[in-house]
Amino acid sequence: MLAAARALRGPRPRWPTPAREHWTPAGRSRSRREAAEAEADVPVFQYVGERAARADRVFVWGFSFSGALGVPSFVVPSSGPGPRAGLRPRRRIQPVPYRLELDHKISSAACGYGFTLLSSKTKDVTKVWGMGLNKDSQLGFHRSRKDKTRGYEYVLEPSPVPLPLDRPQETKVLQVSCGRAHSLVLTDREGVFSMGNNSHGQCGRKVVEDEVYSESHKVHRMQDFDGQVVQVVCGQDHSLFLTDKGEVYSCGWGADGQTGLGHYNITSTPSKLGGDLAGVTVVQVATYGDCCLALSADGGVFGWGNSEYLQLASVTDSTQVNVPRCLPFSGVGKVKQVACGGTGCAVLNAEGHVFVWGYGILGKGPKLLETAIPEMIPPTLFGLTEFNPEVQVSQIRCGLSHFAALTNKGELFVWGKNIRGCLGIGRLEDQYFPWRVTMPGEPVDVACGVDHMVTLAKSFI
């Protein structure tokens, strides 16, 4: 029976056997020469040229229905050419990074309350793009395609923001910043431009009673500073300006003392701050809600504005501080960067350690909800191990109620309130410890908003 089966099956085919040229007896390793020859025989595949430049990428995530992510298909059902066109559902929340397709190299990004600004240092006429909520013309005037006399209150994709530049082919945009309903654009040779709601003077111009901000063409230019502005920052309804002389100017809403000008009134003209900042060279300012921080050249930290959440409790019991105060933090080392959100603050020292204080989810677990004294987040939570001893945090950012940190190894960590998926970690629960955001690129800068984020990145190859 077995013989008959073998006869029907025919002779067993002979498969090629693996070559044995590199076989060595057990217990004897190959010589260095043999190993080098074997390595030289291995084929080399070169997929990318040696001089190939890594491509620039922009990733967005969070709440999309405001249009702030710049992806129209998330807001309006797609209507492609296929037979099932229009059946793709809208996407209210994008919980993980999504690549935004752009034709320009973006150098600065800012997230406002439901809107986004992007800018490029290009010499082309168009240098700034906006997307999202535009009910106060914080993105400029965007003409309706149906009615040329009307403007859009929602901009669903990155659209050019017109600026009244005198030399558009020479002037570069260095930075953008967004508040609750106003925006600032910093240029290298034509001052600062402001757009949007000015009901508190936050755009640096006279407040006009009953001014209509919707569908407005108004873009205001500010140039009356003693020195050149090198950084602009929008708070909720106020603005901060840092000059190359290390001086800080402010304007806007001052009810919590956030203008730092010694009173609680509104200010429509950018004015220089004094207090403990008098004679101090400032290198960075930070704000997003109603509290402000400044960093001096020698690593000193100064604060003013709202202190309802213990932001300034290290120097005062008052909940509003209207002049800059030096915050005498000990044990944090030399500070090289500051960040300020709605209820929490953070500093980064020269050793790459992050310290947090204030109220809310601060990054040290659910047991730490408030503190007036900065506490260090364990460096191991940012990837520091005995196998990776060189890992350091290189940048910190604050949204309204969440934090972000970039490391020198090109990794992005986030923590805080996960409002509408703004953390980009693939789930909607709040995050009490730093958590790494995964994306197909190496993040180099990040902007935090209320319920969305934008990251500038480089492709891996």
Swiss-Prot record:
Transit peptide endpoints, chain numbering: 1-34
One GO CC term on file: mitochondrion
UniProt-listed Gene3D superfamilies: Regulator of chromosome condensation 1/beta-lactamase-inhibitor protein II
GO molecular function terms attached to this record: guanyl-nucleotide exchange factor activity; rRNA binding
The RCC1 repeat ranges on this chain: 55-121, 125-188, 190-244, 245-297, 298-350, 352-408, 409-458
Pfam families referenced in this protein's UniProt entry, alphabetically: RCC1, WD40_RLD
Record keywords: Membrane, Mitochondrion, Mitochondrion inner membrane, Repeat, Transit peptide
Localisation per UniProt entry: Mitochondrion inner membrane
Region (Disordered): 1-35
GO annotation terms (biological process): mitochondrial fusion; mitochondrial large ribosomal subunit assembly
Residue pairs linked by disulfide bridges in the UniProt entry: none
Signal peptide (residue range): none
UniProt biased composition (Low complexity): 1-10
Subunit structure: Forms a regulatory protein-RNA complex, consisting of RCC1L, NGRN, RPUSD3, RPUSD4, TRUB2, FASTKD2 and 16S mt-rRNA. Interacts with 16S mt-rRNA; this interaction is direct. Interacts with OPA1; this interaction is direct.
Domain free text: The RCC1-like repeats assemble into a circular seven-bladed beta propeller structure. Each blade is composed of four antiparallel beta-strands with loops between each strand.
Purpose of the protein: Guanine nucleotide exchange factor (GEF) for mitochondrial dynamin-related GTPase OPA1. Activates OPA1, by exchanging bound GDP for free GTP, and drives OPA1 and MFN1-dependent mitochondrial fusion. Plays an essential role in mitochondrial ribosome biogenesis. As a component of a functional protein-RNA module, consisting of RCC1L, NGRN, RPUSD3, RPUSD4, TRUB2, FASTKD2 and 16S mitochondrial ribosomal RNA (16S mt-rRNA), controls 16S mt-rRNA abundance and is required for intra-mitochondrial translation of core subunits of the oxidative phosphorylation system.
Protein name (database record): RCC1-like G exchanging factor-like protein
